[in-house]
Regions:
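Short alpha-helix capping/helix-loop boundary micro-motifs
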Residues: 59-63
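HotDog/MaoC-like acyl-thioester-processing domains
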Residues: 7-9, 64, 69-70, 81-124
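Hot-dog-fold acyl-thioester-processing enzymes
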Residues: 2-56, 111-124
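A structural signal for short, hydrophobic beta-strand segments that form beta-sheets
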Residues: 56-57, 80
Length: 124
């Protein structure tokens, strides 16, 4: 059983895409977006339920919808979508800050653990 949090808080991070983030095609190397998505999912989950000890359980498909090039500024967002018994689902997406074009979408499931085992979340 899951429920949607009463207060929907959206988290935001703004990044300048520097040369060290680029692949051999001059576009953003996908692993950086994946790392930032994981960071943002953790932040959203942990700020929504501060008493939890979250780890990443899984990610949905990483959908890169448009290229990000050096010098672009992107905004990455995360938001708790639903909260279950031991975990929560976080949506993560990014847009080009100058053009507002979608560049990336995914979701993460963050699970509350103690001693390596999933444990129930305290309801907020």
């Amino acid at each position: 059983m899951s429920y949607t949090p009463a207060i929907e808080v959206r988290h935001e991070k703004t990044l300048l895409i520097r040369s060290e983030f680029l692949n051999h095609y001059g576009t953003l190397f996908g692993v950086y977006m994946m790392q930032w998505a994981d960071d943002m999912a953790y932040n959203a989950a942990s700020l929504a339920i501060p008493s939890a000890n979250f780890v990443t359980k899984l990610f949905g498909q990483f959908d890169f919808t448009s290229a990000v090039r050096g010098g672009d500024i992107i905004k990455i967002y995360s938001q708790v979508e639903s909260i279950g018994n031991t975990s929560c689902k976080i949506k993560v997406w990014a847009v080009n800050a100058r053009t507002n074009a979608d560049v990336f979408r995914t979701f993460a499931v963050m699970v509350n653990v103690r001693e390596g085992k999933a444990v129930p979340l305290e309801k907020i």
